[in-house]
């Protein structure tokens, strides 16, 4: 049995978890800063780092007190080393390294995007390699050829705004506050289909890249030309969401055909979007493919996925060198560069 304590502080959520290779996730706690950023309309990196520093120690104490987990059970401390916000990453790395030192255990550095990609492995029914992965979050939109653990090939990515970023900016223009993506999706449910017709970016391009900046600008112009009527806002939200989802689904099917794969994994914060899941499920059934998602509680940032990947990388990549390491731009396709 291997027991890994995980720490995730790459952006604005402070997360801790413990993963046991025999029993799975035995402790998982997330502190969200979203209410703080509703006032600002988005994340303020310096505030995020300060809040991590304030909250992380409290959450770690909860592992041993509320979770009643003995410190002697911990075999290693895994923390997110990138990609992410510099200040936020440094808090997790510093505290994680100090904790490992105090427990006399090694550290394991985990790539945030690899952790998202592998989160469906926490479920009872797991995907098998190789498969196509769609990673969709506030900062990333990528299509990955997943050949095996640690073996990833980038097939396509956004050339500008990530999906989550585009959602947040359109939501802000609609006056929906932060977090924008979930608020926009709620509003979209009241929208009347077919009222607007927005472009589906790059769907006619043969490559597997995405682009959402043009769509975002197009929608922002539509918002400016219309009044603040609730129904109009809902109609705009619905068509924008459909345009984004269509773009993602079309590229996924194109990539699956290109690779001659039959398995798709969808991970990241945006993967909990019910419209995205509905469209993917429909098209996957049509082609007789298989699709795997993260559990809804593991779609957004969490430390369970960090602890899990830490358990996989433990034997090969654990380090007793307690030098604090982060890489804000750490790519999933170049895991050796940390």
Curated annotation (Swiss-Prot):
Substrate binds at residues 135-139, 168, 181, 273. Coiled coil: none annotated. The keyword Transport does not apply. It catalyses: L-threonylcarbamoyladenylate + adenosine(37) in tRNA = N(6)-L-threonylcarbamoyladenosine(37) in tRNA + AMP + H(+). Binds 1 Fe(2+) ion per subunit. Fe cation binds at residues 112, 116, 301. It holds the Pfam family TsaD. Belongs to the KAE1 / TsaD family. Required for the formation of a threonylcarbamoyl group on adenosine at position 37 (t(6)A37) in tRNAs that read codons beginning with adenine. Is involved in the transfer of the threonylcarbamoyl moiety of threonylcarbamoyl-AMP (TC-AMP) to the N6 group of A37, together with TsaE and TsaB. TsaD likely plays a direct catalytic role in this reaction. PANTHER family: TRNA N6-ADENOSINE THREONYLCARBAMOYLTRANSFERASE (PTHR11735), TRNA N6-ADENOSINE THREONYLCARBAMOYLTRANSFERASE, MITOCHONDRIAL (PTHR11735:SF6). This is tRNA N6-adenosine threonylcarbamoyltransferase. It comes from Buchnera aphidicola subsp. Baizongia pistaciae (strain Bp). The lineage of its organism: Bacteria, Pseudomonadati, Pseudomonadota, Gammaproteobacteria, Enterobacterales.
């Amino acid at each position: 049995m291997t027991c890994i304590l995980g720490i995730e502080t790459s952006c604005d959520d402070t997360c801790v978890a413990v993963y046991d290779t025999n029993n799975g996730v035995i402790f998982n706690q997330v502190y969200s800063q979203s209410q703080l950023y509703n006032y600002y309309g988005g994340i303020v990196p310096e505030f995020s780092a300060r809040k991590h520093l304030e909250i992380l120690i409290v959450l770690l104490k909860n592992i041993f007190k509320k979770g009643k987990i003995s410190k002697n059970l911990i075999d290693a401390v895994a923390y997110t080393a990138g990609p992410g916000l510099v200040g936020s990453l440094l808090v997790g790395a510093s505290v994680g390294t100090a904790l490992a030192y105090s427990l006399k255990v090694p550290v394991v550095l985990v790539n945030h995007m690899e952790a998202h990609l592998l989160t469906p492995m926490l479920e009872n029914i797991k995907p098998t390699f190789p498969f196509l992965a769609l990673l969709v979050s506030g900062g990333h939109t990528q299509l990955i050829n997943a050949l095996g653990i640690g073996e990833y090939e980038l097939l396509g990515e956004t050339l500008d705004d990530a999906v989550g970023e585009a959602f947040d900016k359109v939501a802000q223009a609609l006056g929906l506050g932060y977090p924008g993506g979930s608020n926009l999706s709620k509003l979209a449910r009241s929208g009347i289909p077919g009222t607007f017709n927005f472009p589906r970016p790059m769907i006619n391009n043969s490559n597997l890249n995405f682009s959402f900046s043009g769509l975002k600008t197009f929608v922002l112009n539509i918002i400016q030309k219309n009044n603040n009527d609730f129904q109009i806002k809902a109609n705009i939200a619905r068509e924008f969401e459909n345009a984004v989802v269509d773009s993602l689904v079309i590229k996924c099917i194109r990539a699956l055909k290109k690779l001659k794969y039959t398995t798709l994994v969808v991970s990241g914060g945006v993967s909990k979007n019910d419209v995205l899941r509905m469209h993917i499920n429909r098209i996957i059934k049509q082609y007789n493919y298989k699709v795997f998602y993260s559990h809804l509680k593991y779609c957004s940032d969490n430390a369970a996925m960090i602890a899990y990947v830490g358990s996989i990388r433990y034997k090969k990549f654990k380090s007793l060198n307690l030098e604090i390491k982060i890489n804000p731009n750490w790519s999933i396709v170049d895991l050796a560069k940390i």
